[in-house]
Amino acid sequence: MIRDAKFFWGVGAICLLAFIAIAILTDQIFEHVPHSEDEVAYVFQAKVFAQYRLAVPTPLNDQAFWTPFVVDFNGLRFGKYAPGWPLLLSLGIRLNAPWLVNALLGTLTLALIA
């Protein structure tokens, strides 16, 4: 199937609108805050990865800093989930815009589907 320039401009416009919609929803509805315990663990691990580390030392009073789905083991604290998503999210953390990762991935997915 041969696609003309109008098609690609249309896809580009839809992707741009999707990116803007995701950015507005992230800002106005979700307020750039993780809303589930899973998300908190992902953001924690992404912040650790953004420091070029795999784990951080456990705080002295670890019970006061308990976080669901974050593991304290042998004096180290790390997320319990696979590192793929936190590693991608760490790129956004380094840019001080973690919301950008979801917006770009959503837009890329939309473009690939078209």
Where on the chain are the PLM-derived regions?
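Solvent-exposed loop and edge beta-strand segments that line ligand/cofactor-binding
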Residues: G12, N74-F78, A97, V101
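Helix-to-loop transition at the C-terminal end of transmembrane segments
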Residues: A23-V40, R53-L60
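Transmembrane-helix motifs of polytopic, lipid-linked glycan transferases
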Residues: W99-A114
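Carboxylate/His-rich catalytic cores and anion/metal-binding grooves
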Residues: Q45-Q51
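Hydrophobic (often cysteine-bearing) scaffold residues that line and stabilize catalytic clefts
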Residues: D38, K80, G84, T109, ...
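Residue-level signature of the transmembrane alpha-helical core
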Residues: L16, L87, L91, L100-L104
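Interfacial juxtamembrane loops and adjacent helix segments
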Residues: Q51-G92
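Start-transfer (signal-anchor) and selected internal transmembrane alpha helices
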Residues: M1-L25
